[in-house]
Amino acid sequence: MGVHAEFVLSAVAQGQFPQDGLPEVALVGRSNVGKSSLINALVRNRKLARTSNTPGRTQALNFYRVWPQGKPRPEGEPQPDKDAGRTALSGPVLQAARESGAFYLVDMPGYGFARVSEAQRREWARLIEGYLLTRGALRGVLQIVDLRHPPTRDDVTMREWIRHHRLPSLCVATKADKIGRTAWPRHRQVIARELGLDGDGEPLVLFSAETGLGRDDVWRWIREHVQDWTFDM
């Protein structure tokens, strides 16, 4: 079986987060940087996370449950209905999820979007910071940047914040297919320098949702930080 993934819920308050205790990996990045496309590429489902050319589309924490070895159906359990992915797991289904290495990808609101009010930006910042600092199920953070452009001030601030709070993280530079391969080293060097990735051993993965470049590297990092399991990527 291949990877199975399902949208579970959108949360605008901590009380709405899933309570089944499965590990979580958060995705942070500026608006329209390609977080949704990255999620879809990881699970090989272009329709899972809604993509848009309009920045600021994601205005909540979107939780996607990922079954890396395919979704099992415990013996005696009825076939789930189309809305089963939206409910909290319990009983045999939760046990099967834990045994199979299921986890959540959490798509967070993009930072740096100018077309919202200052009050809305503060509310998003409060929600994101509260999640990243207090969520016990969080295993790591994928910071997404655009390979085509130097990091923004918000990218640098987020990197420093992640480093300050010692959160396990991986920086992923998306849209590698949008520039020529010969330009990759130069663009990679700029991003690494601006984000301070050169001297402390923090990796930077080049990624393309179109070609699959970097997909295995991101999965490898997720495996190392969620738990040990093997699966058909």
From Swiss-Prot:
Record Pfam families: MMR_HSR1 (PF01926)
Gene3D superfamilies associated with the record: P-loop containing nucleotide triphosphate hydrolases
Biased composition (Basic and acidic residues): 72-85
Residues binding Mg(2+): S36, T58
Gene Ontology MF terms in the entry: GTP binding; metal ion binding
Keywords: Cell cycle, Cell division, GTP-binding, Magnesium, Metal-binding, Nucleotide-binding, Septation
Chain residues that bind GTP: 29-36, 56-60, 107-110, 174-177, 207-209
InterPro entries: G_ENGB_dom, GTP-bd, GTP-bd_ribosome_bio_YsxC, P-loop_NTPase
Gene Ontology biological process: division septum assembly
GO cellular component: cytosol
Cofactor: Mg(2+)
Region (Disordered): 68-87
Record-annotated EngB-type G domain positions: 21-228
Sequence similarity: Belongs to the TRAFAC class TrmE-Era-EngA-EngB-Septin-like GTPase superfamily. EngB GTPase family.
Annotated function: Necessary for normal cell division and for the maintenance of normal septation.
Listed name of the protein: Probable GTP-binding protein EngB
Organism encoding this protein: Symbiobacterium thermophilum (strain DSM 24528 / JCM 14929 / IAM 14863 / T)
